[in-house]
Structure formats: structure tokens, C-alpha cells
């Protein structure tokens, strides 16, 4: 049975992220349930709070090791939330980074219609808000940006369309979304359905080689949405041409892509990203599926080693 976590009640009880207050029992329960308390890291400070973006209350968390020398800002994927990213948080702390993450609107503890968004431009507003939180917390520069799937889409959109950010370090794209797999069929289905239904039931996929993770997400995670809103698909369909039509960039992201990924159309996406970002460095993992943040340990270590060499 999933743990009893009431996201609305917990969110409403939280202070602003910029305020340092003692964690409530409900906050501690949430962090312990998802392993975000990281009990083996006894010298790490952590904080859970919220900030406002448009009409959304966005819930965020920060972790500080002793004497951090840079920061890692994390953007999760569609249907995900911060609670599923403990491996990346732990790796960031091991690297000596302060770590900052948030739940996107409609996900995890943040407000908004479940698993939906009006336009992908709202995700850019959330990223701008996350940067502002990093400034208020005075997180050490540079700020490395890591995005998984839709989080990677948000990050690459920022690189392609926003002014140069002097605080930004390297950008890490894990299985980044440009087009999902079978996009033409999905788009036709969307056009047929959007006038008649607002959502369809979610179909869970085996998007990781870690069976314990798949079991947790499908039966033990109380923050998992169980619908696919047609509004989100519509927002995606309007966003894809913005990315595919964008001018090339001088940024040099680090791209990790699994070749067993059945969620995004990586054979289409990778050539586009390699054209947009001529300086990109790409690591392809033949056995890795889509959810790289929660792949088998040996696959996680393979890309952590790749990143460590480039961020040390």
C-alpha cells in the first residue's frame, strides 16, 4: 500500500523556500519515505519549501553539503517528481554540489491540474523561478542544470531561446524529449480525441531495467498521476516546432541517451540536438531504457563516471 502523503495539505503547511525553519513531522515523513533524508550523509543540511510562479505554488527542496563549490539544479520528467531523484541528489552531494530541485506544476507536491500544463512556456517560467530561488539561497556558482526527459526539454529550450546566463555551468540532458516515440500516431489520436475527452487513462511502461523501481512507481508511489490529459499533449504539439525550428546554439550540453529507450524517439531527436548544439558531448548506452535517473545501478554509474570527468 502507498504511504499516506497528502500533497495539498503538506504543500499548504510549507514556508517559503527562502525561510529556514524546522521541518515538520509531515515533511520528515515525506523525505524519509522517498529516501530524500539521505541518512548516510550526516553533515548535509536540507530544506523543503515553496515559491510562487504564475498561479502555481511550486514546491522545492535544497540540500547543502559541507563547503559546496558549485550547484546542481534538477528538472524532473513527465509523471515524475523530486521524490524519485534521490540517486541524482546523492551523486550531486558526493560531487560537492549544493542541490536544488522542484516539482513541476501538476506533479508531486506542486499545485496545478494533475500531469497537465497550458503551454510549455509555463515550464520556462518555473525554471526562471528556480534560478531566482538559487539566487535568494546564494547557492555557489556555477549552477549546473540537469533535466530528465521533459526536464531535459525544459533545459534545452532555455539554452536555445534565453539570453546567456553567466551563472549557468554545464547542462546535462538525460533522454531529452523533443518528439516522443510514435509521435505521428499520437498526434492524430490527439486531434481526434481533443474535442470529446479531456484525459485518457495512463498506461505504465517498463521504462527502466530496475524492477524494484517499476514496482514502486506502479503500486507504492502515492504521487503518481494515473491520467494523460489531452491539454498536455496539445501543449507538446505546439512546443515541438519551436524547438525543431530554433537556431543553432553555441552551448555544449552533455547528452546521455539509452538505446533501449521506448519513450522518446531518440533516433529522431539525437541528430536534431547534435545539429543544434555542435559542441554537444553524447554518451549512448546500448542497454539503457528511458528513465535514466532510475536505471540499474551499473548503468547509472556509467553515466555518472562520464559526467564526473567533465564536471570535476
Task: Indicate residue ranges for each PLM-predicted region.
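Conserved alpha/beta-hydrolase
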Residues: 89-113
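An N-terminal hydrophobic leader/cap segment in hydrolases
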Residues: 1-52, 58-64
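Alpha/beta-hydrolase-fold enzymes
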Residues: 146-231
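Short alpha-helix in the alpha/beta-hydrolase fold that links the catalytic acid
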Residues: 251, 265-274
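Catalytic nucleophile-loop/oxyanion-hole region of alpha/beta-hydrolase
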Residues: 78-84, 107-138
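Active-site glycine-rich loops that stabilize anionic/oxyanionic intermediates
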Residues: 69, 77-80, 259
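Short beta-strand/loop motif that positions the catalytic acidic residue
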Residues: 249, 255-261
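Catalytic active-site module of serine/aspartate enzymes centered on a nucleophile-bearing elbow/loop
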Residues: 280-312
Amino acid at each position: 500500500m502507498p504511504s499516506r502523503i497528502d500533497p495539498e495539505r503538506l504543500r499548504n503547511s510549507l514556508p517559503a523556500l527562502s525561510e529556514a525553519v524546522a521541518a515538520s513531522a509531515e515533511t520528515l515523513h515525506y523525505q524519509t519515505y522517498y529516501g530524500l533524508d539521505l541518512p548516510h550523509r550526516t553533515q548535509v543540511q536540507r530544506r523543503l519549501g515553496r515559491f510562487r510562479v504564475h498561479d502555481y505554488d511550486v514546491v522545492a527542496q535544497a540540500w547543502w553539503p559541507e563547503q559546496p563549490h558549485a550547484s546542481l539544479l534538477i528538472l524532473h520528467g513527465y509523471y515524475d517528481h523530486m521524490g524519485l531523484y534521490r540517486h541524482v541528489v546523492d551523486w550531486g552531494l558526493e560531487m560537492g554540489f549544493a542541490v536544488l530541485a522542484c516539482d513541476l506544476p501538476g506533479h508531486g507536491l506542486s499545485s496545478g491540474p494533475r500531469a497537465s500544463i497550458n503551454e510549455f512556456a509555463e515550464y520556462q517560467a518555473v525554471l526562471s523561478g528556480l534560478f531566482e530561488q538559487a539566487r535568494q539561497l546564494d547557492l555557489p556558482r556555477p549552477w549546473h542544470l540537469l533535466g530528465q526527459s521533459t526536464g531535459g526539454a525544459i533545459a534545452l529550450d532555455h539554452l536555445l531561446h534565453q539570453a546567456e546566463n553567466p551563472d549557468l555551468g554545464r547542462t546535462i540532458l538525460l533522454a531529452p524529449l523533443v518528439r516522443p516515440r510514435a509521435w505521428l500516431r499520437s498526434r492524430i489520436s490527439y486531434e481526434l480525441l481533443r474535442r470529446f475527452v479531456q484525459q485518457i487513462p495512463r498506461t505504465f511502461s517498463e521504462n527502466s531495467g530496475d524492477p524494484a523501481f517499476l514496482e514502486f512507481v506502479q503500486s507504492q508511489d502515492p504521487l503518481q498521476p494515473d491520467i494523460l490529459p489531452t491539454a498536455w499533449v496539445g501543449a507538446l504539439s505546439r512546443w515541438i516546432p519551436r524547438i525543431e525550428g530554433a537556431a543553432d546554439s553555441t552551448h555544449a550540453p552533455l547528452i546521455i541517451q539509452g538505446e533501449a529507450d521506448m519513450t522518446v524517439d531518440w533516433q529522431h531527436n539525437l541528430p536534431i540536438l547534435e545539429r543544434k548544439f555542435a559542441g554537444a558531448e553524447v554518451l549512448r548506452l546500448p542497454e539503457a531504457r528511458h528513465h535514466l535517473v532510475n536505471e540499474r545501478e551499473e548503468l547509472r554509474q556509467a553515466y555518472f563516471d562520464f559526467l564526473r570527468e567533465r564536471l570535476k
